[in-house]
């Protein structure tokens, strides 16, 4: 097991956690057995493989590898911190051990997806008491994983999926029509991965078409790295550019233009959390998910806007599911709050009664 000493140190400080045989952290059953948990923000190889060039489209079935060790987050075990966004502290100097590790992980961390097969997802859901999950597709222009994901969700009642149409697709209308004949529960838009600004003309035109379907739209939102990291050479120039595509101020025109559309702004705004709280107060048609956010921020969300528009999500496989579950347990004060966040809000959206 990699990082065995450091992982056991984490266990000594968090009685709710244990280690699976592959070295990933999981929740102890005693702490989760009374809850129905729906992970509203997951990814899988099958839903994202089109983002990779053909030479890297390789599904890995080794369930003995810890996904936490392969992913971007935490940036290193030395930086692990359950009370921070991404459950990781952030280095501010490239020429340091953690700075170099972070730069490498920002480049290689996406390859954890090769191991995040449907079989692995279901296994990890079982380990963490998660009953159902929403898998979000992300597609480059003129490609999609609609048929593959349709076959998967049709064969497994524990899984749902959100469709993905790129704003630069040549025939957006036909893709939307095809998806609407599938069992999708909503739409996924990812500006920083797909290379467009959420408020650009093409994006707004796409959102208008998606809004007509009546399905909710989940968008990655907020600054994905803190300013103190962006001011260094740790991220590449392209990464620095891409993370700006979903700044929360860019969402103002989106939300003002489509006040009747149900949006889920993912990650609670990442490192723009305070701005997300204000945005949620202003726009009652907006939900958020708590993927990557620590307990302190989740507690603030509940105190400021209530628990009825907060969704449980993890951003699996990039973030260990147990950390987000533990964060909700620590942030909530009663069973009603936990029920809303873990499952009730998700059921409302998945059943179309929002």
Residues covered by each model-derived region:
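Mid-to-C-terminal alpha-helical segments outside catalytic/metal-binding sites
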Residues: 1-36, 50-106, 116-123, 132, ...
